[in-house]
Regions:
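Catalytic-domain carbohydrate-binding cleft regions of carbohydrate-active enzymes
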Residues: 1-191
């Protein structure tokens, strides 16, 4: 918030986390210093996951009173991930002018392509190979739509997000088809 108060929100996997107001100009340099430590340790990219930000359930009302520099969270939540990705890229380039950053995010908004690679998010197969085929089929229109929506660099989790699948021959076939599809993605990566 503008009074530098942190809004805590329940983390989907337990506990709380803070929501950084990337719309506040002073936050950029603070975040740049924060992210520089892992860069100095050798990383060259960031996966800005859950930039919506994700809520563990929609019944939680904390977001209704969360005020950012540009307005109430429910009014600007679609641009939240974009502002995060913008700060990450600009701060990386400012502090590391001779290096190139890699970023990947699932929180898409107009202009995303200027800062980061798009990612379709976790596509879960659960514990069932038949669900995996459905998830693979879903990725094709999602990635094509992203490209038509001017986010040409979009990828998915090759093999989905599997649980404990014990039907190994069926999983091997699905895995092969995921890899074949992934070979035609702008970024091919196995999850």
């Amino acid at each position: 918030s503008t009074d530098r108060k942190s809004y805590d929100m329940p983390w989907p996997w337990g506990g709380n986390c803070g929501v950084v107001d990337f719309t506040l100009p002073a936050v950029a340099d603070w975040w740049g210093a924060y992210q520089q430590k892992p860069i100095d340790d050798g990383i060259s990219g960031f996966w800005t996951d859950m930039g919506e930000p994700a809520w563990s359930n929609e019944e939680q009302t904390e977001r209704l009173v969360m005020k950012h520099h540009l307005g109430m969270h429910d009014e600007i939540h679609n641009v939240y991930g974009l502002t995060w990705d913008k700060v990450v890229k600009e701060q990386f380039e400012k502090r590391n002018p001779d290096r190139r950053v890699f970023q990947m995010t699932r929180a898409a908004y107009a202009g995303l392509q200027r800062y980061t690679f798009g990612w379709t998010g976790d596509c879960g197969n659960g514990d069932d190979v038949s669900q995996g085929w459905g998830q693979l089929a879903n990725q094709i229109p999602v990635i094509l739509s992203a490209g038509l929506g001017l986010i040409p660099f979009t990828t998915c989790d090759i093999t989905g997000y599997c649980g404990d699948i014990e039907d190994y021959p069926a999983m091997a076939e699905l895995y092969t088809r995921w890899i074949q599809f992934g070979a035609f993605n702008p970024l091919s990566r196995i999850h």
